UniProtKB/Swiss-Prot annotation:
It comes from the Eukaryota. It is found in: Nucleus; Chromosome. This is Proline-rich protein 19. The keyword Transcription does not apply. It comes from Bos taurus (Bovine). Transmembrane segments: none annotated. Residues 1-53, 104-149, 245-280, 308-332 are annotated as: Disordered. Residues 250-259 have a biased composition (Polar residues). GO terms for cellular component: chromosome; nucleus. Residues 1-11, 265-274, 314-323 have a biased composition (Pro residues). GO terms for biological process: meiotic cell cycle. Its main location: nucleus. Promotes meiotic crossing over formation through its interaction with CNTD1 by participating in the crossover differentiation step of crossover-specific recombination intermediates.
Length: 363
């Protein structure tokens, strides 16, 4: 060999470009999958080869209009689903019998009628009753396959539920009341008076007179005159005078002013809220922020004294308020007896910091 010649290379196949296989589409994959599962899904013989008696017998039952194939993600025909491309349930029987909704109630009644009869046979045999064949000889005529009796259905249902007192007559309302009363007696040892709860009153305290509370609960105090309840009126007047003497500066003449201010305003409007019968503080609950604001606002605003020519009218018995003192500023009538002082005077007297309250009128 010539040394200038290149050495012969061993035999090699020429390199071919890599073959890119085309991926099948979803339709092709579904068709291939449907072709493999077709004999498993559809096994009914054609209609022409069936027995005519069987065709008449099965004409009531719903039959599939055409082949239904459940593939990876869709059906081959329209169905009642959430989406057209999804199958939310794998219940093939429900999908195949979707025409039963269109047939109406006869298909449902004929389909559900033989089920109680089949369920009755084991229960009758277990109870040891008559185990005759429906068409056999018996003392009475052969019973046709009809719906069972209502009492029989109730008895079987009672046996299946294993509830001995499921169907006898029961007074459920009385049982509920007995259960509530038993729970109250077990927890608290007594049953509360429901009349007090319905009227929104608390039971009387041991230190108070039950007769006075009863009279106060039956009739509002603004209807009663001082002659009907003289002791209560005097006691409440004394307590109101004490509170007012504590709250108002000593410069003003307290007894005369507040005898005048306690009078109800004359007019067609109802009596003020302060004169209405108010239960104890426990009945109203703890004081709220609005009560605190009223106490801050109204304590430092004494009304100007009235002229001496006005005589004191008749006084009305009023229950003492647990939070607020008795003053004419608490009179929530449409026309207050005296105008309130200015906001600047109130801020200067009651608070070290400037409160920006809007001009407000209690009603």
């Amino acid at each position: 060999m010539d040394p200038g010649e290149p050495a012969p290379k061993p035999f090699q196949q020429p390199e071919k470009p890599g073959r890119v296989r085309r991926r099948k589409t979803r339709r092709e994959r579904n068709e291939a999958l449907a072709g493999s599962r077709q004999p498993l899904t559809y096994q009914h013989p054609p209609v022409a080869s069936r027995d005519p008696h069987m065709v008449l017998r099965n004409s009531v039952a719903p039959t599939a209009a055409k082949l239904v194939v459940i593939t990876q993600g869709r059906l081959s025909r329209d169905h009642r689903g959430l989406f057209n491309h999804e199958v939310k349930s794998l219940d093939v029987a429900r999908l195949l019998s979707s025409e039963s909704l269109e047939l109406g109630t006869p298909a449902l009644t004929t389909k559900s009628s033989p089920s109680p009869g089949r369920g009755q046979q084991p229960s009758l045999q277990s109870r040891g009753k008559e185990n005759q064949v429906p068409g056999g000889s018996g003392p009475g005529p052969p019973s046709p396959p009809q719906l069972p009796d209502l009492e029989q259905l109730l008895g079987e249902l009672q046996c299946q539920l294993i509830l001995p007192r499921a169907f006898p007559r029961r007074n459920l309302v009385q049982e509920a009341r007995d259960a509530i009363v038993g729970t109250l007696q077990a927890c608290h040892g007594c049953v509360p008076d429901l009349t007090l709860v319905l009227r929104g009153c608390q039971p009387h305290l041991p230190g108070t007179d039950p007769g006075a509370l009863k009279r106060q609960r039956m009739t509002p105090s603004w209807i009663n005159s001082p002659e009907q309840a003289p002791g209560e009126g005097r006691q409440r007047r004394r307590q109101g005078t004490k509170e007012l003497t504590f709250a108002v500066p000593p410069t003003s003449s307290t007894p005369t002013v507040h005898q005048v201010s306690l009078a109800p305003p004359k007019g067609p409007w109802p009596p003020p809220l302060s004169s209405l019968p108010s239960p104890s503080g426990a009945a109203w609950g703890p004081p709220t922020a609005f009560d605190l604001l009223k106490s801050i606002w109204l304590v430092a605003t004494p009304p100007p004294p009235r002229p001496w020519g006005i005589g004191p009218p008749q006084l009305l018995p009023q229950p003492p308020s647990p939070l607020l003192p008795r003053s004419s500023a608490l009179d929530w009538s449409p026309s207050p007896p005296a105008p309130l002082p200015s906001l600047s005077w109130m801020v200067a007297q009651s608070s070290p910091e400037a409160w920006s309250f809007p001009p407000m009128r209690l009603y």
